Each structure stands twice: as structure tokens, then as C-alpha cells.
């Protein structure tokens, strides 16, 4: 009989007193750190796929951001990008990771890039999955209105309103049901929705790095995973394309026309990451 695959190893890292970040790691080999998006958890970077840890020769480390999933709310009340970058540094330090591939989704992509700009010696490669950060914080009332409404829904425990405010009901019918279910399941994984609500207020108002021109400073190879606007308008294809254009060593991948976004397909996304890392083993 085949040897059973051991379960992921849970861990807790405390970047500051009163803040516990919960995560897990699995596999051995080159280290891949997963950094999730706003209102998501560690599961949603590669959609729960365990292919990379089990067959990809990688040590896969994932964690829930402050206030998300199983992690606690920060005692200082800060959820912006400087805090997220500091938390990522703490994860690497406490898990004895000198250098890693960092894969981030949406908010996590901006966090990973900001970390690489601050600590280039600790990053071997990047995977930017559906980047949405366009180089500046949101400042206008119009840009912030929907985020504040989503935060209010979370504070009220009104999951139905939160789901509706994500815009899933305006997606093409072939994507609508899956997107609606995914949003609902994602929100139900948080132990403290009011902490997530505060993150939803703060992150859009926070700057990860100052302008897309800074992308040219990144020397490591970067896999940019784009989604088509039809299924995922909140992560514009044009933004991912601009990342790929400005980065010194980038590969842009996306789904076939008419398919669900590659970022929604854990096994396919994992294979794309594995192929990219096979080409960049340094």
C-alpha cells in the first residue's frame, strides 16, 4: 500500500504581543510562501490544491493574514500594507526561511511585491495572482464607497448583502453560481468577521508601494496570473498586463477564452506555478 501523505503541520507566529497568525506548512524542498487576498484565507491562494506540496518538490507555507481566517485581530488596529509586509517578514523569520518564492493573490500580490522591494535578498521569485493594486491608495469617495458598504455588511453579519455587494450577480450566468458560492464560503471561514470588516476599510486606503514605476526595480522572475474581465472585473486584465510590461523578467498567463479564470482553478494554477518554477530553479 502507498505511504499515507502526512497532513499539513499547523503553526502560530506572533509578530507582536496579542497578534497570533495561524498557518500551516506541507512538503519539503524549495520554499513557497502563500499570501492571500482581502477577505480570503490561506486556502484561497491556490484554491486548496495540495499538488505543489505533494508532487512539486516544494515546502508550501500558508498563513491567514491579521484579522482573517483563524488569525487574531491586531491589538494596534492596523491592517494596511506596512503591517502586512511586516507580518510576512515575521513569518519568514519565525519559520526559519532565508529566501523563498512568494505567491500572492490580489492584496497578497501587492504585499509580496512590496516585501520584495524592501527585502530583495529574501525573494527568489514571485507569483502575482490577479494583481489589482494600480500603484496608489484609493482616495476618492466613489472609489471607497463600495468597500465601506461591504465592511458595514460584514459588521452587521449580513453575508447576503456582502455577497451582493461583490457584484457577482452581474457576472455572466455561466460564472455566476460558482462565484457566488465561492464568496459565501470564503466569508464563512473567518472567526471574526468584524476584524475582516476593518481590513476591508483600511486596505483600499493603504499604499503597498508608490507607483507602478517601482515594478522595474524587481529583478527576480515573476509569474503574473491574469483573469479575463468578463468573469473577474475587480482584477482587471489591464492591470496584470501592466505589471508584466513593467517587470524586468515576467511571464503572463491566463485562462483560455470562455473558461473560468485560471486563478479559480487550483490544480491548473498549481501546474502553471510548477512549470514557471521549473524554468527558474535558482
Question: Which residues fall in each region the model found?
Answer:
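Conserved HGGG/HGGXW glycine-rich cap/lid loop of the alpha/beta-hydrolase fold
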Residues: 15-73
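Active-site loop/oxyanion-hole signature of alpha/beta-hydrolase fold enzymes
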Residues: 16, 61-103
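Gly/Ala-rich beta-loop-alpha elbow adjacent to hydrolase catalytic centers
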Residues: 104-108, 112
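Flexible "cap/lid" loop of the alpha/beta hydrolase fold
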Residues: 113, 117-118, 123-155
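Conserved alpha/beta-hydrolase catalytic His-Asp/Glu region
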Residues: 138-141, 156-205, 209, 214
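Short beta-strand/loop motif that positions the catalytic acidic residue
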Residues: 218, 224-226
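Conserved alpha/beta-hydrolase "acid-adjacent" motif
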Residues: 231-239
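Catalytic active-site module of serine/aspartate enzymes centered on a nucleophile-bearing elbow/loop
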Residues: 249-282
Amino acid at each position: 500500500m502507498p505511504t499515507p501523505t502526512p497532513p499539513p503541520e499547523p503553526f502560530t507566529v506572533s509578530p507582536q504581543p496579542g497578534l497570533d497568525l495561524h498557518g500551516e506548512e506541507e512538503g519539503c524542498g524549495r520554499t513557497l510562501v502563500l499570501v492571500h487576498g482581502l477577505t480570503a484565507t490561506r486556502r484561497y491562494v491556490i484554491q486548496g490544491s495540495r499538488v505543489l506540496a505533494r508532487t512539486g518538490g516544494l515546502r508550501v507555507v500558508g498563513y491567514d493574514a491579521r484579522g482573517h481566517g483563524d488569525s487574531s485581530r491586531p491589538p494596534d488596529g492596523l491592517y494596511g500594507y506596512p503591517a502586512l509586509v511586516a507580518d510576512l517578514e515575521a513569518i519568514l523569520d519565525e519559520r526559519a526561511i532565508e529566501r523563498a518564492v512568494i505567491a500572492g493573490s490580489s492584496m497578497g500580490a501587492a504585499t509580496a511585491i512590496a516585501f520584495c522591494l524592501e527585502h530583495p535578498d529574501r525573494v527568489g521569485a514571485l507569483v502575482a495572482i490577479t494583481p489589482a493594486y494600480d500603484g496608489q491608495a484609493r482616495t476618492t469617495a466613489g472609489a471607497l464607497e463600495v468597500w465601506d458598504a461591504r465592511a458595514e455588511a460584514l459588521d452587521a453579519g449580513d453575508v447576503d448583502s456582502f455577497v451582493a455587494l461583490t457584484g457577482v450577480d452581474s457576472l455572466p450566468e455561466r460564472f455566476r453560481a460558482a462565484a457566488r458560492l465561492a464568496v459565501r464560503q470564503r466569508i464563512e471561514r473567518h472567526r471574526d468577521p468584524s476584524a475582516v470588516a476593518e481590513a476591508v476599510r483600511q486596505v483600499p486606503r493603504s499604499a503597498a508601494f508608490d507607483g507602478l514605476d517601482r515594478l522595474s526595480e524587481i529583478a527576480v522572475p515573476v509569474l503574473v496570473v491574469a483573469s479575463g474581465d468578463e468573469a473577474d472585473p475587480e482584477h482587471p486584465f489591464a492591470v496584470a498586463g501592466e505589471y508584466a510590461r513593467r517587470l524586468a523578467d515576467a511571464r503572463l498567463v491566463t485562462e483560455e477564452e470562455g473558461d473560468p479564470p485560471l486563478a479559480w482553478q487550483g490544480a491548473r494554477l498549481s501546474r502553471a506555478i510548477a512549470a514557471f518554477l521549473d524554468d527558474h530553479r535558482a
